[in-house]
């Protein structure tokens, strides 16, 4: 039962990622509700995996465990930053909270959202035990190419390093295309996370 709940929570977070990234096309109100849903799923994910946090200072650390610790702590910081900055910028659900500094909140929210996309996808990939027929699976290189194409087309590097503080949205594109692009980027970094974990496992 607990395993099924854990899977449902993880799948829910993966589904919400591309939807949240397409916020301008989805709408501000929907984005805020999706953001709250993501934070609640994040809390549920950590509660379901509370043993991992309890065992941080126990046992030996190999390469994989060190990487997981770094990624998990960064994701925790990112999610807290997204939640606080999101509440500060809210024009709908939390509009009654009037906090100054929305320009800083917007910059933090932008930075955290794109790093969150990368690291949460990477984190998910680290927990994939095995990709069936990976050497003969033609879908892997296809997803990698689609992910790289979307990564470049969406100027992700500019947002990761705040070279651009405003997300350029092409409103002529359909919501589906935008969501698919972010989904492909997410899948790309899941594959990267999976590959890095396998490499570290051979070195351990």
Task: Identify the residue ranges that each predicted region occupies.
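Membrane-embedded alpha-helical bundles that constitute the cytochrome b-like, heme-associated redox core
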Residues: 1-204
């Amino acid at each position: 039962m607990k395993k099924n709940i854990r899977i449902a929570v993880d799948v829910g977070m993966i589904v919400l990622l591309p939807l949240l990234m397409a916020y301008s096309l989805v709408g501000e109100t929907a984005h805020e509700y999706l953001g709250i849903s993501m934070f609640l799923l994040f809390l549920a994910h950590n509660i379901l995996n509370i043993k991992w946090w309890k065992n941080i200072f126990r046992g030996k650390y190999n390469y994989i465990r060190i990487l997981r610790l770094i990624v998990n702590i960064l994701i925790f910081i990112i999610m807290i930053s997204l939640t606080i900055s999101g509440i500060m910028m809210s024009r709908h659900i939390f509009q009654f909270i009037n906090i100054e500094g929305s320009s800083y909140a917007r910059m933090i929210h932008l930075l955290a959202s794109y790093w969150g996309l990368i690291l949460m996808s990477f984190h998910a990939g680290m927990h994939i035990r095995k990709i069936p027929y990976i050497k003969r699976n033609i879908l892997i290189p296809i997803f990698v190419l689609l992910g790289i194409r979307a990564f470049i087309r969406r100027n992700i590097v500019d947002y990761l390093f705040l070279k651009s503080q405003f997300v350029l949205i092409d409103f002529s594109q359909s919501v589906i295309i935008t969501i698919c692009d972010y989904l492909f980027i997410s899948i790309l970094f899941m594959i990267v996370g999976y590959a890095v974990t396998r490499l570290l496992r051979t070195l351990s």
